[in-house]
Regions:
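Conserved ATP-binding subdomain of kinase catalytic cores across diverse folds
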Residues: 1-112
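Conserved kinase catalytic-core segment
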Residues: 116-133
Length: 133
């Protein structure tokens, strides 16, 4: 297996808690993510959660990103905390799409910068019907 670092990412899109990097794994561009640890030392199990969510979505025939686990020792640039695995997914953005940051999306939708991004996001989301009634 051939693994090479392409780009180490900042952690802005996950509240700054997950270490991420883009790697080429056997010629395929992949996003590799570690796990979190909070100020009290509580370890997050995000790699396992992402793989479980991916598997559930697959069973339910939802469109989804397919995540899988790999041994963290192959990815020294991705920080992990007391786990042996990282989550991995292949590059997922089609060539004819443009990536827009959450920050820019909110400002474009509202035409101003909100004081509370979470509240702004809730206003922008379409109303969701409950799944179970």
């Amino acid at each position: 297996m051939l693994i090479e670092l392409v780009k180490k990412n900042a952690t802005k899109t996950s509240r700054g808690i997950l270490s991420k990097a883009w790697y080429k794994i056997d010629g395929k561009l992949c996003l590799v993510k570690g796990n979190s640890v909070d100020p009290n030392g509580v370890i997050g199990h995000e790699p396992y959660s992402e793989v479980m969510a991916s598997n559930i979505a697959k069973l339910l025939h939802f469109n989804h990103l397919e995540y899988f686990l790999m041994d963290a020792k192959f990815f020294p640039d991705v920080k992990i905390h007391k786990l042996k695995h990282v989550s991995v997914c292949e590059y997922y953005i089609p060539k004819d799409f443009k990536v827009v940051s959450y920050y820019n999306y909110i400002i474009a939708k509202l035409a101003f910068e909100p004081a509370d991004y979470f509240e702004a996001y809730k206003k922008i989301l379409p109303a969701q019907r409950p799944i179970l009634q």
